[in-house]
């Protein structure tokens, strides 16, 4: 399987996606379901396909994805990052174009931890003057 497939790992928030691509007809399988079945929202589906449309490869590759952790938005971002890395593994000449679009860079924003004595990461208890 590894011989004909190109691989990329994508991460976003607490989601991790393992992406395998090979030449094909444009089918995208995420955790055993089509991308439309797995991601209900159209925006999440578009996010997953952005690197393919940018490089004019929307119908050129079959993609198999295993993704876990996080929610729908984070998983879609992880899939996009993984697809980008797999495309670069397939053809390094695509890297400048994908990099200019900002798809190569890992979005490092994570949830800030809750602090002791506070309601959340920054929300404090209501102050009473009297």
Curated annotation (Swiss-Prot):
SUPFAM superfamilies: Ribosomal protein S5 domain 2-like. One of its GO terms (molecular function) is RNA binding. One of its GO terms (cellular component) is cytosolic small ribosomal subunit. The keyword NAD does not apply. Keywords: Ribonucleoprotein, Ribosomal protein. This is Small ribosomal subunit protein uS9. The lineage of its organism: Bacteria, Pseudomonadati, Pseudomonadota, Betaproteobacteria, Burkholderiales. PROSITE patterns: RIBOSOMAL_S9. Pfam families: Ribosomal_S9. Belongs to the universal ribosomal protein uS9 family. It comes from Leptothrix cholodnii (strain ATCC 51168 / LMG 8142 / SP-6). GO terms for biological process: translation. The keyword Transmembrane does not apply. InterPro entries: Ribosomal_Su5_D2-typ_SF (IPR020568), Ribosomal_uS9 (IPR000754), Ribosomal_uS9_bac/plastid (IPR023035), Ribosomal_uS9_CS (IPR020574), Ribsml_uS5_D2-typ_fold_subgr (IPR014721).
